[in-house]
UniProtKB/Swiss-Prot annotation:
Function comment: Plays a role in nonsense-mediated mRNA decay. Does not have RNase activity by itself. Promotes dephosphorylation of UPF1. Together with SMG7 is thought to provide a link to the mRNA degradation machinery involving exonucleolytic pathways, and to serve as an adapter for UPF1 to protein phosphatase 2A (PP2A), thereby triggering UPF1 dephosphorylation. Necessary for TERT activity. Required for normal embryonic development.
Protein known as: Nonsense-mediated mRNA decay factor SMG5
Protein's organism: Danio rerio (Zebrafish)
PANTHER family: NONSENSE-MEDIATED MRNA DECAY FACTOR, SMG-7 SUPPRESSOR WITH MORPHOLOGICAL EFFECT ON GENITALIA PROTEIN 7
Compartment(s) of residence: Cytoplasm; Nucleus
Source organism, top-level taxon: Eukaryota
Keyword Coiled coil assigned: no
Length: 1099
């Protein structure tokens, strides 16, 4: 005990504390006896037991204020556990006995409400007693008496003040828990309230990870556990983590593994477009969760399997980002009712994308800290994911900036009653916002004002109710129509993946992944938890989530299989055992009765596997803190080269089903300097606009992270009118993914070693980033326009073009990621404790623009030649110096001819398109240089002798990436016949099996199609000649002679043999005729040794 002196008063106080503590122990013992009984759920709400709990509550309150340092925490714990939590657990454990509208249910509801009232009162009393200043942190603040005009003197010690601060934090956690338990009851919507309490607890004590664990429990199985994973990782990486989060996260990863293998096993099934969207999003989220579970520090996996999974997730991520919100319909036919709920899960919200990217950053940080061998793979995947994200930001911004330039029909052809659609309060205002938020809102008559504000809008936008209502009043009817045209323009970008077959080529730009049948699920609906949920009182956190609504049985967001008790009082069941005071993970452990099935072979992995030639990188001075920097750099470049691969310009044979697809209709005339893109894909069936411009198709041309066509350049559009600066800033303000870009660039700025190691292998990322930088307005132009910016923002604008910009203004995304270890260096200059000036959404947007453009100049100063900046034209480029000089000259000529301000946007797009044209020409040259074109064929067809005797040479040809090796069925049959007596045949079979399993795009097995002459008599007389004839038939399929094409196919295919040509011709007349048939079919027959020597001589 502590006391200032040993006089009689402290002695009396000590005796009083002892008596209180003894009374508390006795009361707790009586309550424990009640709780341990078999029918405790009936006993807990009897009047005498309620009185006993009330007595314990009074004793605990007295004890904690008499001696807060020694007894405060213990009294809090006993009060929460014995008075509230254990009663709640008894009821939840026996919920099958608690029927709806029964006396027990009524008593339970009253118990929860009484707990909320008590802790709110306790929170206010602690603030008042210790004069705490929490106005910027929480809603329930103590208001000083205005008549006094000054604070009361506080005689508490520093330790007592510390306890008071943390007691307020814990009260907020308890309030969040009580709201979460209320949310599980039928007819109660308290999820947003619980989330708000948890965020306020974080604002009071941001270093404590407990509220993150509670947010993860609150999220439940929404978005297939991705959201919960984000919160558990945040809890684990907090300064004071909660031990229970480790078990909770492990349980989610175990679920992810099971769900991933279930998804892979499900049969393919044709679905409606909206259900297909839900299935694609489910596949993405489940695969993403499984990948993150494999990237944990203690896990180990084969590199090829990990690479295959990374590529699959990237394909799905790129596909799902093309899904934009469907327009709201005023009326709905009966046939559409089945798909009504699917729209809820048909879009990936921006807040979820934010969480996914931050999960990647947290995993990279933990792998680096643990010196894990998965570190390189994690970085390569994260950069590739961000590359896709930047590309889609470019596409969306470009579509907004070019709104009205071309007539694009609406995606859906349903007859929509526009008048009814306009009756929705958010129809006119939030169509543009739904792009940012990523999901459509559901109507709720009880909260009309929140419906108008876009509940799922991230906090980063900071829009208030009043601001939105004023904007809505100011909008004219013409502007409403303008918004609708804009939405149809954006909705055109949606597409679905094309169907694929076993013999489909890797070389098309389309997407491919297994389609699986959506499993039927039951679960309570839940609002979307905002990933940017910074605990700031001034923000309308209650109005940023998607309102809870009925979720689809097939393709919904919920992945859990919680059962709804038919007649019980509980609506949903969550893992509420993961509560604030206990690590109850042992109570929730799900014993796996069977081992997880092995992951199916990735036979259809369509991603390329190129040779891993390491690029020379500048010396890294700030490398990862692992044992072998050179090994990390090598592995990172190799992994990046696989995830960021350059497309090759091959003309695909008709044998492969996914031949190059071209736009179905006319194309707007393009400038002479901007030829049509090399490869394009059409939108999917069921969502195909009538007029698909090549620019839009080109934007979707992105199967792997390194697409030549960035999709956001539309330089061949002539502008009828340029967007004003205010309109451009409004578009940027409404683009929610800009926040994710800003956060990721903050991380990259503090990890220059990663930038330098991936400078060459991640060229696609820098290309897309340069396009985004050119779309953002310059700081000087914003300063010249009077748009009513904050004074501090104006000062920041003056340094916008400096590479060493020091951000001092806090953004919502910075607050949301406060104390995140991965961003600790980036946030070292930010003051999270001082009073922040209020920033409007426009101010926040301008700050993001400053940070992103400053990062662009930061890249131009790096020694790896990542980006270049042309001061006169004011544009960024990401090409070699010689190409840059050429582009700069053209830019200057066009810049002088154009009007400086009105033509600025078009110039930037022209420059970007020229850069892409040069890249395409470079890639075309890899196969179409004069020397190579004259004597080298793109398709090589080896015979059995090559695979048995010259497998090493064939490996080198395949690894070069210059040829596609086609293995006909007849060659495989020949190897099968020789495998018993020929070891070379067995080696060849093993080699082919390995390459097919990896999905090597340069070694393909050809499936026979079309009519083939069997020559059964010849097969008996001369087997080798018969095999050669069969190979000629296979090659005819490659050259397209069975199709109606008019192209010259001479020299397209070379048959490689392990025998000398003279020897073959002298063997028999049948063999000689077969050799002549090769030449007659326009093919070449060469000895592999001679072919290899000739190829080496030509370089």
């Amino acid at each position: 005990m502590s006391g200032p002196s040993q006089d009689s008063e402290p002695e009396a106080k000590v005796l009083h504390i002892k008596r209180l503590y003894r009374a508390v122990v006795e009361t707790v013992h009586k309550l424990d006896i009640i709780i341990s009984g078999k029918s405790s759920y009936r006993e807990v709400f009897k009047p005498e037991n309620i009185s006993l709990r009330n007595k314990l509550r009074e004793l605990c309150v007295k004890l904690m204020f008499l001696h807060p340092v020694d007894y405060g925490r213990k009294a809090e714990e006993l009060l929460w556990r014995k008075v509230y939590y254990e009663v709640i657990q008894v009821i939840k454990t026996n919920k099958k006995h608690i029927h709806s509208r029964s006396a027990l249910e009524c008593a339970y509801r009253t118990h929860l409400i009484a707990g909320v009232g008590f802790f709110q009162h306790l929170l206010l009393y602690i603030q008042s007693h210790y004069q705490l200043e929490l106005q910027d942190c929480i809603d329930w603040t103590h208001v000083t008496d205005p008549l006094i005009g000054r604070k009361k003197p506080v005689s508490a010690t520093s330790k007592e003040m510390e306890w008071a601060q943390m007691a307020c934090h814990r009260c907020l956690v308890y309030l969040g828990d009580l709201a979460r338990y209320q949310n599980e009851l039928a007819g109660v919507e308290a999820e947003q309230l619980a989330e708000r309490f948890y965020h306020q607890a974080l604002s009071v004590a941001p270093h404590v990870g407990m509220p993150f664990n509670q947010l993860g429990t609150l999220a439940g199985s929404k978005f297939y556990n991705v959201e919960a994973t984000y919160y558990y990782l945040r809890c684990i990486q907090s300064e004071t983590p909660f031990d229970g989060a480790y078990g909770n996260l492990k349980r989610l990863f175990d679920k992810a593994s099971k769900m991933y293998h279930q998804v892979k096993k499900q049969e393919m099934k044709k679905l409606s477009p909206s259900r297909q969207r839900s299935k694609d999003i489910k596949r993405l989220l489940v695969s993403f969760m499984y990948l993150q579970s494999l990237l944990q520090p203690k896990n180990s996996l084969m590199e090829t399997e990990l690479t295959s999974l990374c590529q699959s997730v990237l394909e799905d991520f790129n596909l799902v980002l093309f899904y934009l919100p469907l327009p709201a319909h005023g009326s709905q036919s009966a046939s559409e009712e089945e798909e009504e709920h699917d729209s809820v899960g048909s879009v990936l919200p921006d807040s979820l994308i934010f969480k996914m990217v931050v999960i990647c950053l947290m995993v990279v940080h933990s792998l680096k800290r643990g010196a894990s061998k998965q570190y390189s793979a994690s970085i390569a995947f994260t950069l590739a994911l961000f590359s896709h994200l930047v590309n889609h930001v470019n596409i969306r911004l470009q579509a907004e900036l070019e709104e009205g330039e071309s007539d694009v029909p609406a995606l859906r052809t349903d007859n929509t009653d526009d008048a009814d659609a306009r009756d929705h309060s958010s129809a006119a205002l939030s169509e543009e916002r739904t792009l940012q938020n990523g999901s459509l809102e559901e109507d709720d008559d009880e909260e009309e004002e929140e419906k108008e504000n876009g509940e799922d809008e991230p906090k980063g936008n900071g829009r208030t109710v009043a601001t939105k209502k004023n904007q809505e009043k100011k909008r004219s009817a013409e502007e409403k129509q303008k918004q609708k045209r804009k939405f149809s323009r954006l909705s055109m970008l949606r597409r679905r993946r094309c169907a694929h077959k076993e013999d489909e080529s890797d070389l098309s730009e389309g997407f491919e992944s297994d389609e699986e049948e959506e499993e039927e699920e039951e679960g309570g609906g839940g609002g979307l938890v905002d990933g940017l949920g910074a605990p700031r009182v001034q923000m309308n956190s209650l109005g940023r989530d998607t309102r809870k609504g009925p979720l689809p049985e097939d393709g919904g967001w919920e992945s859990g299989s919680e059962e709804d008790e038919g007649g019980t009082a509980f609506d949903v069941e969550t893992d509420s055992d993961m509560n604030s005071q206990e690590s109850r993970s042992d109570l929730e452990d799900m014993e796996d009765a069977e081992n997880a099935p092995q992951q199916p072979q990735q036979e259809e992995n369509e991603q390329p596997q190129t040779s891993r030639e390491e690029n020379a990188t500048p010396p890294v001075t700030n490398g990862p803190s692992v044992s072998n920097d050179a090994s990390i750099s090598s592995n990172l470049q190799a992994m990046s080269s696989q995830l960021f691969q350059a497309k090759r310009c091959f003309r695909l044979a008709p044998t492969f089903s996914n031949v190059l697809l071209r736009p179905a209709t006319t194309t707007p005339p393009a400038p002479e300097s901007n030829p049509a893109p090399v490869q394009e894909i059409t939108p999917p069936t069921g969502e195909t606009p009538r007029n698909t411009s090549p620019e839009i198709a080109n934007g979707t041309n992105d199967k792997d992270p390194d697409s030549n066509s960035e999709g956001s350049e539309h330089s061949n559009h002539s502008f009828h009118s340029e967007k004003t600066l205010s309109e451009r800033l409004e578009i940027l303000t409404n683009q929610g993914l800009i926040q994710v870009v800003k956060v990721f660039l903050d991380w990259l700025r503090t990890n220059t070693d990663i930038i330098l190691m991936c400078a060459q292998s991640s060229q696609s990322l820098w290309n897309r980033l340069s396009v985004l930088l050119n779309l953002l307005p310059e700081g000087s132009k914003i300063l010249e326009t009077d748009i009513g910016l904050n004074k501090d923002v104006t000062e920041l604008l003056s340094e916008c073009e400096h590479p060493s910009l020091a951000q001092t203004l806090l953004l919502p995304e910075d607050m949301a990621l406060r104390h995140l270890p991965a961003l600790s260096i980036a946030h070292r200059r930010l003051d999270f404790t001082s009073q922040r000036p209020p920033l409007t959404p426009l101010d926040e947007c301008v700050v993001r623009v400053c940070c992103i453009r400053s990062f662009g100049h930061f890249l131009t100063n790096l020694q790896g030649n990542v980006l270049h900046f042309n001061p006169e034209a004011g544009i960024f480029t990401s090409i070699s110096q010689s190409e840059q000089d050429n582009l700069v000259q053209q830019a200057k000529a066009q810049f002088r001819m154009a009007e400086e301000e009105a033509r600025r946007n078009r110039l930037m797009r022209d420059m970007a398109q020229l850069r892409l044209q040069l890249e395409v020409s470079q890639l075309e040259g890899s196969l179409q240089q004069p020397k190579a074109q004259s004597s080298m064929s793109p398709y090589l067809v080896p015979d059995t002798a090559v695979l048995c005797q010259h497998l090493g040479l064939l490996r080198q040809l395949a690894a070069s990436g210059c040829f596609i090796i086609i293995i006909p069925r007849t060659v495989i049959d020949g190897l099968d016949m020789l495998k018993k007596e020929n070891s070379g045949a067995r080696d060849g079979i093993r080699f082919l099996e390995t390459e097919f399993r990896k999905g090597n795009r340069y070694i393909r097995c050809q499936k026979e199609s079309g009519r083939s002459f069997e020559r059964d008599k010849l097969k008996r007389q001369d087997t080798e000649a018969w095999h050669l004839y069969k190979m000629v038939d296979s090659c005819r399929q490659l050259t397209g002679s069975q199709s109606s094409g008019d192209e010259d196919t001479a020299g397209m295919v070379t048959i490689l043999t392990g025998h000398s040509l003279e020897e073959l011709s002298e063997r028999s007349a049948s063999m000689k005729a077969a050799v002549q048939a090769v030449a007659a079919a326009g093919m070449e027959l060469k000895n592999i040794i001679e072919f290899y020597r000739q190829w080496k001589e030509m370089g």
